Amino acid sequence: MNSVRKRVIALLSFILLEFLIIAVIVRQTEVGMMSKPSVGSRSNNENGTQVSWLIIFWSTIFGVVPSWVEGSWKKGDCPVACELTVNKSRVNEASAFIVHARDAHMIPPTHSVPWILFTQENPVYTPVLNDSEFMSKFNLSRSYRLDSDIPNPFYDVPDLKPPVPFSEKTGLIFAAFSNCEPVRIEYMRQLMNFVPVDSYGGCLRNKNDLVLIYGKDFKLAKTELSRKYKFTLVFFNQDCDYFVNDQMTHALNAGSVPVVMGTDKVDEFLPGNLRNAVIKVRDFKSPRHLADYLLYLSGNETQYNSFMDWKWKGIGNITGTTIGNYWQAHYPIECQMCVALSQGRIHKEGLQAIPCKRRAYEDWGIIPGA
């Protein structure tokens, strides 16, 4: 009888021990699930919390190792300790990897931590952005788009350098395109039928002054040359949502009214007093209608100078606008990536594809050869 009792007690003890072990494992799993995103994370202190964030720039940028992006920010200079490096030997320390969309063949070796996609090019020239399978591999976006997780448009706050006075502007329309995208060049060609356009770029060039100084600072030279023109053609290479680049900054800096062809969302890049600083091609039925308006303004100093009000009044209130937040950011863009990671602001199911239809002649009311 005693032997039977001992066996029963031993069996019950064994069952109780197994139960306790299972309970501990379940509890550890629950804690782990609460503290880790599905794509993985790195904890770097004793209680499992992350105290510093290391992002490895895994790809090149247009084939060049981007060593210029490297830097580190201690807590205080950034809400979290943050480091960005191109040192791939530190792969086991990584909190995230960043990949440039135009160098998308360089994929990180592990998906145990988030992947960040960086681009300042639009989907027409970067087809992977419209590839659902490719985009689903990434968990955070840093791009030119103002609706990106981390907006990083190629468009800086314009300066308030006074413009050349109206009476001293000797040129009418300035243009300098290096990419001869066919629709914008056809529009410019038709515009030239009704109004003089001085073209310094590689497309329909009729002026050579800019070519002579191309070996210096090209963008600075372009800005300085355009200062004596009343208008500058700012025709972006496609009409993709939010695609705005430094062409518009250069024209605004020069005090030469930008004549803009591109995204319907351009107003989101023109907060405060900049709202009335540009002329939008889309507001005109044809190149002839646009030409008539530009000629009218060129002979009306008061109306023309209304586009320059922001130069004297300042940019104005840009609080609460996405582009204003970008211009007035307290922390560098690299730090903002670390903050997004620390707050768990990642897309665990991946990013959505970004569609963009290639520009067509009919989008701008023109017929080729007309």
Indicate residue ranges for each PLM-predicted region.
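Catalytic toxin/effector domains delivered as secreted proteins or via bacterial secretion systems
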Residues: 121-124
